[in-house]
Swiss-Prot record:
Protein known as: DnaJ homolog subfamily C member 22
Transmembrane segments: 5-25, 32-52, 81-101, 105-125, 135-155, 186-206, 218-238
The organism of origin for this protein: Bos taurus
Lineage, opening ranks: Eukaryota, Metazoa, Chordata, Craniata, Vertebrata
UniProt keywords, alphabetically: Chaperone, Membrane, Transmembrane, Transmembrane helix
PANTHER family (alphabetical): DNAJ HOMOLOG SUBFAMILY C MEMBER 22
Amino acid sequence: MAKGLLMTYTLWAVGGPAGLHHLYLGRDSHALLWMLTLGGGGLGWLWEFWMLPSFVAQANRAQEQRQGSGRGTPPLSLIRFVAQMIVGMYFGLVALISLSFMASFYIVGLPLAVGLGVLLVAAVGNQTSDLKNTLGAAFLTSPIFYGRPIAILPISLAASITAQKHRRYKPSVGSETLSVRLYRLGLAYLAFTGPLVHSVLCHTAVTLSYVADTLGSFLSWFSFFPLLGRLLESVLLLPFRAWKLLVGDHGISSSYFQEWEKLYEFVHSFQDEKRQLALQVFGLSEGATNEEIHGRYRELVKTWHPDHNRYQMEEAQRRFLEIQAAYEVLRQPRKPRGSWRWEETSF
């Protein structure tokens, strides 16, 4: 039966973040992806507003596409590649939170989780990729970064590149009943959320330690990109601030809430650590004025500008980037410790 555009937009508006419109169009992989990410954090759901007509047209000519499936290679998509990277890291982070207690987790559990996240995005729409090669790339990469939470980044990169290299159109399959499709989606959803919910509810402190370690590794990678680092910190702290704004201090038990406050403090402390490192780069002490910072910046830039150090170009470029990054950090006004509590209670 032909799919209607009006019905698709209605389902998109009513249950878009849960993937109802994709379920209606027979895009089960896309529906599962939206279920597990709440519509790609909301951004993917909003962006789809302009894509729904093409999704409906694709669903209505699905039979013709099946007949021509397997012929040729789908065009390379930068958006799909980036989405594979992000979802792969997201699956890896969830695995770190919920399954890191397992033996050989970094050899089996982590690459499997990241690889499945990459494959889920690869299977969106009328495309798919090779399961063995994609998971193989993930498993081969994981031992190189064994025991490090940051391993989810190179594993996701390797799996995404492999998935793009082996991309192809989906083969022809027979139609399935809605109950079978819902059963499969339900099992996949429970497999993803079950361990996570158990870990969060029963092992809060341990869960937070893994989250903190992982966030620390990620944020440290952006120490030379202050603007991007601050954006990531704001995104990470947004759920906490929203929860505080909605329920205050009485939404959950104080002992439980204190555990999550520790995570907030952990992420928030990166501003102080980055400022101390920036002061070391400038050779200044705490309490330096803006005039002193600006003057020292001009001196260091003049000394280490690559054009003035042609015989040690590599060292000059490295120091020049350090100086620029440190200056961006020191330019930002510093909030006193604990000011975030006052900001939230002032509401």
